[in-house]
Design a protein with these regions (language model features):
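Periplasmic plug
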Residues: 98-101, 106, 117-118, 134-183
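Outer-membrane beta-barrel translocator/receptor signature
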Residues: 160, 172-175, 186-265, 271-275, ...
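Acidic/polar loop-and-plug regions of large Gram-negative outer-membrane beta-barrel proteins
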Residues: 247-251, 263-270, 274-337, 355-385, ...
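Structural signature of Gram-negative outer-membrane beta-barrels, strongest in the C-terminal barrel
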Residues: 268-272, 385, 404-416, 451-571
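Surface-exposed extracellular loop regions of Gram-negative outer-membrane beta-barrel proteins
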Residues: 287-300, 417-420, 483, 508-553, ...
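Membrane-embedded beta-barrel scaffold of Gram-negative outer-membrane proteins
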Residues: 333-337, 343-349, 353-361, 518, ...
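Conserved C-terminal beta-signal and adjacent last beta-strands/turns
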Residues: 407, 520, 547, 635-744
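Gram-negative outer-membrane beta-barrel transporters
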Residues: 470, 568, 587-673, 717, ...
């Protein structure tokens, strides 16, 4: 099997004799790829090869890039997120970006949301705090319990509880983060029309590597991390990896802190080149996580009669607020190739998630009881989730005349049991923003609901990647059945909701020898909607469709990649308030998101890394039961996002091993509510990074590295987003970290 693309190695697959000869004539890189093609394929074209020029043999490293393995540098060549097969990014007819481990290390990211700051189409800074990593993709997102989180890990969905329980993965355990923008239900089932974030776990390596790192920073940040990996047997059939960290830090708001302990052991058994079984496990405990409460626009975004509310102001109850998360996962990834045609994969994961939540928050509908005095409420919830996700795949690579087919058939299943015991909203004592009194007595509200929710989802899908000459066509369809049973244990009631949806995608890419690849696609998605109308009829799924067109570029050496895309997404059956029965909803809403995305990732020369991105978004409400919001922009979605990251490896004598990096992020203006009564101003932020590999100049210090990172260098005070006049979030202030590590 070889990696194939016009003029360069790019994907495993068959070559027709004529196509192979054309690639050989393109140069040595193509010759190296073609040399690895199964002999039976080339045997068909021996006669045609007589006139081919003889080139100097080139050694080829058998460790080609895959969609789940390490990436050399900041530009990935292959991804599984867009097709569930190892496919070059230039052959995927949809917006797709990959955040590599090298980029995460350069920027010292502390959350998956942090890793997306330099990615087009993504806005992950809508609120601070490590409870829920709310991510907006192509204008679609949410807040609080409705937040859209990075929801895929190793191609499998992560669990979501009834309300506040959500899985969060620490980026230190990840090899890469793939962002597929636009509807992805054809492969992954129910999903936001904005796209998915698929996180890929670190896996055992064939070569031994060991890392210990210590980090400190402002706000009393302290962290210890480790990463050990390597073979367990001399023949390399067994390999292990254990990575993790322990961290504590004060959060930006008073009385808030973040604590985390995570460990992720994994084990790989590879008896031969055709079979691989990897056991993936992890345990994460967030004993105290900052629940960053919202504040009113008056006093933060706009001057208030009581003055400015400081960024460190805590609107909650110090003796009550808490978010304690325990998360344990065990699963495996199995892959076996029977022959050059047939391959099977099976991915399975079980997740147990416990969340204890206590929180006091500002009543965003009526934030003040008097000038400068906040109106608050409090609630609590105890949630437990047991979740199983399974994905079976059969892949076949066949030739039909001059046409190559990569056919993927799959069956996925997801089952969860989520329970929640929770209060209603109780009254919390008012809080004066000028002289806050956190010692006021309060009453914890009693138990108000006990819910057990059991969702089951079964999906079958079929995809064909068709390669004919310079064309690559991707066709796929999926049928999914979803059933959710909700039991009200307090009142003895039960509700059952069953849904069925078909989604599909069609796309085409044309591959030029120059490396340019224009593409176009159409795709659909769906999301189940729980609940009923006033008359008791269950809601139907929310559905969306997208049209997208763009151009990608990949240089022959795979060190430079660029893309531009234009898209138009329409989401229908969105819940809106029933005008005849205000305490119920109807499905009369429609949201449209149009935009343009640009991205460039390049290694210029031998020492300079460049990551650039730009996003233009026009996300508006096209239909709603409330005429006041029709035609208005969706809250918290910036119209413009732009970023530039540079990292340079110094070559001066005496400073070799020094890397200097820096980035600029522009977050454009957004609206503060869905009726566009006020705006959230734009802001420009600057980040810096320094690292020094001490062993480059001094052999005695081999393996030692020191680094420093600064986010929001000029300590800008800004609002990251608002969802109403009573709900706004301050953006993160200046963050400084320094670390020292030893690798051997």
């Amino acid at each position: 099997m070889v990696q194939r693309h016009v003029g360069r190695c790019a994907r495993p697959g068959f070559l027709s004799p004529r196509a192979a000869l054309r690639r050989i004539r393109n140069g040595a890189a193509a010759f190296a790829c073609a040399a690895a093609t199964p002999a039976i394929v080339f045997a068909q074209g021996v006669a045609d090869a007589a006139d081919a020029p003889l080139l100097k043999p080139i050694a080829v490293d058998g460790r080609r890039e895959t969609g789940i393995g390490p990436i050399d540098g900041i530009a990935a060549e292959v991804s599984r997120a867009g097709t569930k097969t190892d496919t070059p990014l230039v052959e995927v007819p949809q917006g797709l970006s990959v955040v590599t481990r090298a980029q995460m290390d350069q920027q010292d990211v502390h959350s998956v949301g942090d890793s997306l700051r330099y990615t087009p189409g993504a806005y992950a800074d809508s609120r601070i705090g490590g409870v829920l990593e709310s991510v907006f993709l192509r204008g679609f997102g949410g807040f609080a319990a409705a937040a859209i989180n990075p929801q895929m890990l190793d191609g499998l969905p992560l669990p979501k509880g009834v309300n506040w329980a959500a899985s969060v993965v620490d980026p230190s355990t990840l090899e890469r983060v793939d962002v597929l923008r636009g509807p992805a239900s054809v492969l992954y089932g129910q999903a936001s029309p904005g796209g998915i974030v698929d996180m890929v776990s670190k896996r055992p390596t064939r070569d031994a590597q060991r890392l210990l790192a210590v980090q400190a920073g402002n706000r009393d940040r302290a962290q210890v991390a480790f990463d050990f990996s390597g073979p367990l047997t001399q023949d390399g059939q067994w390999a292990y990896r254990v990575d993790g960290l322990a961290r504590r830090a004060d959060a930006q708001a008073d009385f808030s802190k973040q604590q985390r302990v995570v460990i992720a052991p994994s084990l790989t058994w590879q008896p031969n080149a055709d079979t691989r079984f990897t056991l993936l496990t992890s345990y994460q405990r967030d004993p105290y996580n900052s629940f960053a409460g919202w504040l009113p626009a008056l006093g933060t975004l706009r001057p208030g009669p009581a003055g400015q509310i400081p960024t460190h102001f805590f609107p909650g109850l110090p003796d009550f607020d808490a978010y304690d998360r325990k998360q344990a996962m065990i699963g495996y990834a199995f892959e076996h190739r029977f022959n050059p045609t047939w391959k099977v994969r099976q991915n399975l994961r079980y997740t147990h998630l416990d969340v204890d939540f206590n929180g006091a928050a500002v009543n965003f509908n009526a934030p003040f009881v008097a000038p400068g005095v906040l109106n608050r409420s409090l609630s609590w919830a105890r949630e437990h989730v047991n979740h199983v996700a399974l994905d079976n795949q059969v892949e076949a690579r066949v030739l039909t005349g001059p046409v190559e087919h990569t056919v993927l058939a799959g069956l996925s299943y997801e089952h969860a049991v989520a329970t929640m015991s929770a209060s209603g909203f109780g009254a919390a004592p008012p809080l004066d923003t000028r002289q806050p009194d956190y010692g006021q007595p309060f009453a914890v509200p009693p138990l108000a609901q006990q819910t057990r929710q059991t969702p089951d989802r079964l999906g079958v899908y079929l995809q064909d990647q068709i390669r004919w000459d310079r064309w690559v066509f991707t066709l796929g369809g999926r049928e999914e059945w979803a059933r959710t049973v909700t039991d009200d244990r307090l009142n003895g009631a039960s509700a059952r909701q069953s849904e069925r949806a078909f989604t599909w995608r069609a796309g085409a890419v044309y591959l030029f020898d120059s490396g340019f690849a224009p593409y176009a696609s159409y795709s659909t998605s769906f999301e189940p909607t729980l609940g009923t109308r006033f008359g008791g009829q269950p809601f139907t799924p929310t559905k969306a469709e997208q049209v997208e067109a763009g151009v990608r570029y990949q240089s022959p050496d795979q060190r430079q990649m660029a893309s531009i895309a234009a898209f138009d997404i329409r989401q229908r059956n969105v819940l809106t308030v029933d005008p005849a029965h205000p305490f119920f909803n109807v499905q009369s809403g429609e949201v449209r998101s149009r935009g343009i995305e640009l991205e460039a990732r390049a290694r210029l020369g031998k020492r300079l890394d460049v990551i650039a991105a730009y996003t233009y978004l026009d996300t508006t409400v096209r239909a709603d039961s409330n005429p006041a919001v029709v035609g208005k922009r969706v809250a918290a979605v910036p119209r413009h996002l732009a970023s530039l990251w540079l990292n340079y490896d110094v070559a001066w004598q005496g400073l070799r091993g020094l890397s200097v990096g820096g980035g600029v992020r522009y977050i454009g203006r957004s609206v503060g509510d869905n009726v566009d009564t006020f705006d959230v101003p734009a802001v420009t932020l600057v980040d810096l990074a320094l690292s020094y590999d001490l062993g480059v100049e001094r052999a005695v210090l081999k393996g030692w590295r020191v680094a420093a990172h600064v986010n929001n260098l000029f300590d800008r005070t800004y609002m990251s987003s608002c969802f109403s006049a009573g709900g706004c979030f301050y953006g993160p202030r200046l963050s400084v970290t320094g670390d020292i590590s030893y690798r051997w």
